[in-house]
């Protein structure tokens, strides 16, 4: 029995459905209407705010313009700083309010949907070639599907970062991150691991939540004989394997799919959890 989530909509009184993809594990939208270049942005914004998703049928570049128009309308709705009665009383309330606003923003922007063919091509005018970006995130396709434009743009950005990589001076090389794996754009924690004194006889170290493998690589480069890097994400482990192989450190690092700590004890444990 196929339990994959499916998106349903109707066109000319005919029911349609397609596989629904969401890396955030969001459920398929219950209300879906077709939209194209003729739909005014105000109308699209109203529908999105009311919980109706827009399955785009027009020009792809105009879909991007529509997403930008939705962003502008959301920005105008943001409460202005300094307005009386709107300031949160505590930092906790401010944090909660910010998270709430960000969640609502993501929900509305995620209402603009794009159709895909089984081979990850987009059947819209002026659509870019996103096959490799989608393949890296979704894997091989088996049937046509629908995903949000916002998610697609994230996939494209991640694909570009994966190709380009991030220069890590401590390694004299680059780290290439996969979609869904934390990218080491900020180097403070890497420099800390690269420069902090190692404990005596540090022959073994644990890198908890190894992600891209950057800290495991730094420890291996510093002379730690064996590093055990753990992660629960298959993507992270595949990413770390590629990076450590490229940096010629894979022989010193044992990557394990483990919930936090591996078996045994180590004199050195490093961890840089995502914020």
Give a label for each model feature:
Residues 186-273:
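Conserved SAM/SAH cofactor-binding pocket of Class I
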Residues 4, 10, 22, 148, ...:
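Generic serine detector
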Residues 130-204, 208-210, 214-218:
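SAM-dependent Rossmann-like transferase core, predominantly class I methyltransferases
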Residues 2-25, 29-166:
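N-terminal auxiliary segments of SAM/dcSAM-dependent transferases
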Residues 1-2, 8-12, 262, 269, ...:
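Generic low-polarity alpha-helical segments
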């Amino acid at each position: 029995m196929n339990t994959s989530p499916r998106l349903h909509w109707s066109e000319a009184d005919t029911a349609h459905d397609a596989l629904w993809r969401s890396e955030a594990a969001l459920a398929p939208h219950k209300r879906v209407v077709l939209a194209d270049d003729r739909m005014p942005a105000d109308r699209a914004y109203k529908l999105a705010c009311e919980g109706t998703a827009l399955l785009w049928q027009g020009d792809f570049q105009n879909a991007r313009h529509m997403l930008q128009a939705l962003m502008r309308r959301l920005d105008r709705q943001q409460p202005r700083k300094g307005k009386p009665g709107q300031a949160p009383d505590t930092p906790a309330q401010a944090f909660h309010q910010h998270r709430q606003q960000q969640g609502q923003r993501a929900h509305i922007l995620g209402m603009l949907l794009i159709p895909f063919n089984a081979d990850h091509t987009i059947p819209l005018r002026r659509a870019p070639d996103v096959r490799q970006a989608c393949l890296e995130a979704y894997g091989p396709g088996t049937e046509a599907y629908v995903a949000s434009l916002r998610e697609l743009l994230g996939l494209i950005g991640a694909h570009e970062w994966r190709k380009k990589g991030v220069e890590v001076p401590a390694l004299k090389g680059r780290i290439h991150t996969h979609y869904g794996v934390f990218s080491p754009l900020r180097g403070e924690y890497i420099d800390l691991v690269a420069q902090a004194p190692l404990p005596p006889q540090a022959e073994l170290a644990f890198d908890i939540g190894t992600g891209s493998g950057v800290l495991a690589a730094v420890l291996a480069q510093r002379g730690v004989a064996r590093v055990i890097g753990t992660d629960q994400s298959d993507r992270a482990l595949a990413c770390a394997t590629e990076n450590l192989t490229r940096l010629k450190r894979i022989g010193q690092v044992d990557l394990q799919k483990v919930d936090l700590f591996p078996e045994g004890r180590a004199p050195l444990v490093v961890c840089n959890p995502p914020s």
